[in-house]
Each structure stands twice: as C-alpha cells, then as structure tokens.
Amino acid sequence: MANGDPVRSVGAALLRRHDLLRVDPSAWNAMLSRQPALADLPLVAGWAGRGYPVIVRRRLCGDDADAVPAAVPLPPSHGKRRIAIALPSGVVAVLPPLLLRDAARAAPRAWQGAVAALLELGQAVETTPRVFGALLWEQATGLPYLTGASDLDLIWPVPDRRILDRLLGALPRLEADGPVRLDGEVLLPDGRAVQWREIAEARGPSAHVLVKSVDGVAMCPVAHLFARAAPAA
C-alpha cells in the first residue's frame, strides 16, 4: 500500500480511530497458529504476507491489555465480515489513514469530479481529507470493496472551530451537487471523532453530539469539542 506518511511504532503515539497497522507476516502466521479457525476464513491466511494492512478497532472488555486491538474487513464478495483480532504491540507499525488524493485513482469514474472538489475544499479550508471505508480498502488491497451503494467515507482533521465551521458550511452543498453520499467524521485535536453530519445538524448552545475514540463513545456538548488538549506526539 503506497502511503507517504511516516510509520510510527505503537508506543510512539496513542492509537487513533482509523489508524492502519502493518503486521509482520511471521507474527501474523504465529497468531493464526493459535487461532486456526481464522486461517480457514477467506483471504485471512495470506493477508499480512500480501502487504495488506489491518485497522485499529475499539478495545473490548475481553481484550488483553497489552495487545493491540485490530480488525480485518473482508470485501462484499466474501461476506463483508469484520474480523476482530488482537496483536502483540511489538509486531505492528502504525500508519495514519490514507490521504484522499492517494486513494483517488481507486474511486469510480463517476466520483472523480466530486473527489476533485473535495480536495479543493480541503485546500480552501486548510485541512487534508483522508479516507476510510470501501475506498480505503479498494486502494489498499486492490480487492473489490466498492459497490454501487458505497458511500465516500472521509476523515477531516479540524484543529480549531474556525476550520470546522468553514468545512461544515461547504460539505452539504458538495454532497447535494455530487453523485455519492459523503459520510465520515471530523477528527478533533485530541484524537476523538464526530460524524460531520451530526455536528452540522446540532442546534442550540446546549446541543450534544456522540464523540468516538478507540476507548469508547460518549456524549459531549458541541461547545466543548475543542476543550481538550491534543495528545503529545
């Protein structure tokens, strides 16, 4: 998977939603030897050996505290299953989600105008969109994840309220004018994320939205979204 972003070790920074993990193939095979049922699932046995990433998932109560919670999403042709796994921290390297500009070539032809407009929007409001969902996995693996019903799932890092307001002022119009539903989240400086549509529809000074992190979900007043400091790198 081509990605110009720097690789981080797990200990170098907190894991964030939608981070990708590159797994050492020998460690992958060792994991499968301990969980042989996984090796029988389509595509899973050779996943790491082909260079495919896995994705960070929310930690569950049964996960080992020292393990990295991850998931393997299979394409629709293989049941669209999301397989939960846990990996030792020493066998993975962390990559941020793929930039939209790097995933654009995997997008359907009908989406290309919308993708170009979204990239222009990112430049105009001073943020850089990244992808998750079907477009990410189509680009990362070359497997057929996109269907006629797929959304375009985007992550928009928003360092401050000014950029958030400018972004939310433009996204609904771009979606209305384009061929694809724009789903996704704004990424707050502290690593938490909120669906952009939910913030756009929030009304009044006391409005709350659902905020997600790798540790769980919680309701948060819109007015307090930027109250927490960004984590140290």
Go through the PLM ranges and name each one:
Residues A2-A134, R173-V180:
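Helical scaffold of the NTase/Pol beta-like nucleotidyltransferase catalytic core
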Residues R161-G169:
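Short, conserved charged micro-motifs
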Residues H78-K80, R162, R192:
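Residue-level signal for secondary-structure boundary sites
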Residues P73-P75, P157-P159, L187:
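Solvent-exposed residues in well-ordered beta-strands and their adjoining turns
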Residues L174-V211:
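Conserved catalytic core of two-metal-ion nucleotidyltransferases
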Residues R82-A84, P88-V92, I199, P205-A223, ...:
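Mature, function-bearing regions of proteins
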Residues L119-L152, W156-R162:
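Active-site nucleotide-donor binding segment shared across nucleotidyl transfer reactions
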Residues A67-P69, A149, D153, R181-D183:
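Broad gene-expression machinery/nucleic-acid interaction feature
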